[in-house]
Amino acid sequence: MALRPWQLSLLLLALLVAPAAPGEAIEGTVVRVVDGDTIHVKLWERVEKVRYIGVNTPETHHPTRGEEPGGREAAEMNRRLVAGQRVRLELDVRARDRHGRLLAYVWVGDLMVNAELVRLGYAQVMTVPPNVKHQELFVKLQREARDAGRGLWRGG
């Protein structure tokens, strides 16, 4: 029996809002880079706001502090890595934050963007349990970036 269009839409919506199993992956296309650690991804016919797990970049539009130093550079690096790209979103224990954003480790091919931003020095480690799957890697990469003076660690 074939599904009617409304039934298929309902099924896809249920899959998007249901709690995800750790390690589950969803594929989509980046349609907007918001800043250094947030993107919009088209998943089927819906666009989801995705926040990178385990990392934090300086803000480009903070509600009280405005643009933070390095925010524009981090956003530009993120744009270079993901804009228009097909991505794989790897989920961890908690799938959404308190703002309703999907939380993910973002992959372009074999490159984990979260880790690459830390490695290049454009993001710092921000661990929010229970999403800690790649925490040790992020801490190691941050130490290396800081020691090498890369990205936001330059000159100070």
Regions found by a protein language model. Give the residues of each.
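Small beta-barrel nucleic-acid-binding modules, primarily SNase/OB-fold domains
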Residues: 2-156
